[in-house]
From Swiss-Prot:
Domain of life of the native organism: Bacteria
Keywords linked to the UniProt accession: 4Fe-4S, ATP-binding, Cytoplasm, Iron, Iron-sulfur, Magnesium, Metal-binding, Nucleotide-binding, RNA-binding, Transferase, tRNA processing, tRNA-binding
Top EC class, one word: transferase
Gene Ontology biological process terms, A to Z: tRNA thio-modification
Name recorded for this polypeptide: tRNA-cytidine(32) 2-sulfurtransferase
Positions contributing to [4Fe-4S] cluster binding: C122, C125, C213
Organism of this sequence: Pectobacterium carotovorum subsp. carotovorum (strain PC1)
Biological pathway: tRNA modification
Amino acid sequence: MSENQQINQKQQYNLNKLQKRLRRNVGEAIADFNMIEEGDRIMVCLSGGKDSFTMLEILRNLQQSAPVNFSLVAVNLDQKQPGFPEHVLPQYLDSIGVEYKIVEENTYGIVKDKIPEGKTTCSLCSRLRRGILYRTATELGATKIALGHHRDDILQTLFLNMFYGGKLKGMPPKLMSDDGKHVVIRPLAYCREKDIERFAEARQYPIIPCNLCGSQPNLQRQVIKDMLRDWDKRYPGRIETMFSAMQNVVPSHLADHALFDFKGIRHGSDVVDGGDLAFDREELPLQPVGWQPEDDEEAPSLTRLDVLEIK
């Protein structure tokens, strides 16, 4: 066997492993939040970015083995941004045989008309886009709307709300739309962005750049994203542990008196969630909760951790 053949075999092996991990992550999220049910018609919002391409492929893959029957329809919103390559997505979707609809709405023109030059257009653009997608879901008879946000997006939103909004609020894997008519799901909620990046690169999706509108980037979100990536590099497992924390909320040990009845605590009350451990030196596990090393990752050094040592 030639060296090139060996390299190709290894690349295919790694790609298969990566696809299985993404399938497992998506399958677990679907099961945990009951995202997809028998007979669902899922409207997959396809932006042309790595996340939505990956979401569509994994959902199509799961469709073959899922215990329930569901259908998919891909939807792209052509907002008439200058330079938008409108032929790319139809060609790709035709090539893989997926039902799709391209919705053409000149939201770009509306935003440019309403927002002064130099101001961020994202808020108005998002509202317009959301309304069009909700209307399209109704027209297509879709029972669920699938968005391509992943685990890193959810964590970034959590920190954005904590740092700038004063709220302990993230991005839910499943929710009712703000018009009260549609169920929105995020099947990639358990998927790591770096896995999606590697998968999209290997698949060579026809990625459409996301900066065609010329809008300024969300600098606050970019700061949070850079911070989390730095933590992930310096402290392997921290990202997984933080996401696990979002799934293990202890209201009695926070400070929201609307969420927990602190006023009702009196002599003789039951001990809730272990009582007060605040004066004890809290022992933390040597290996971060929820972290599992992949073949291409090294295990973190097993030094003892305590609250004071976490930076």
